[in-house]
Amino acid sequence: MRLAAPLVALVVTATALTPAAPAQAAAPTVKISRIWYDSPGSPDSGANSSVNGEYVQVKNTGRSAVNLRGWTVRDQTTRADHVYTFGTFTLRAGKTVTLRTGKGRDTSTTLFWGRSGGGTYAYIWNQTKDTGYLRDARGRLVHSCSYNSARSDYKNC
């Protein structure tokens, strides 16, 4: 009996010192769900309807709303005008917002980057290869989506 107490203590100590399995990073609840990089029609005219034909969709797969104020979407270039910053916008649980490249009136489901004019310079997404980045208000990468194909007009992420 006198041996039982030290033996139990040894087992408890050994169990406490056993390293836990590494935790896997949780999948983001807000992510880029689609990039439509080749607007309909050819050639790309730079008209607002054509520019709005390219867009990125951001989806909240979580169970609670997420405040996107200060979050950014950008492509892989380092150009400052290729960054969209969310203003006051809350993405409800299970919902998707479409961010169109051109100009328009923002709604609860569609936002507009505000780019226009400049012909093909109004477009954001390259038609053959690019990467979309979604960052939170602190600048931390939340999700990215890359494509490398001219055989399709869009990429589901």
Report residues per predicted region:
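A structural motif detector for short, solvent-exposed N-terminal "entry" segments of globular domains
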Residues: 2-10, 19-69, 121-127, 147-156
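Solvent-exposed beta-edge/loop recognition patches
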Residues: 24-30, 42, 81, 88-157
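A mature extracytoplasmic/lumenal domain signature
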Residues: 36, 62, 70-72, 77, ...
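A short linear-motif detector with a strong N-terminal bias
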Residues: 36, 51-53, 76-78, 112-113
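Residue-level detector of beta-strand face positions
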Residues: 57, 72, 131-133
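The feature marks short-to-medium sequence segments in extracytoplasmic or secretory-pathway proteins
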Residues: 66-91
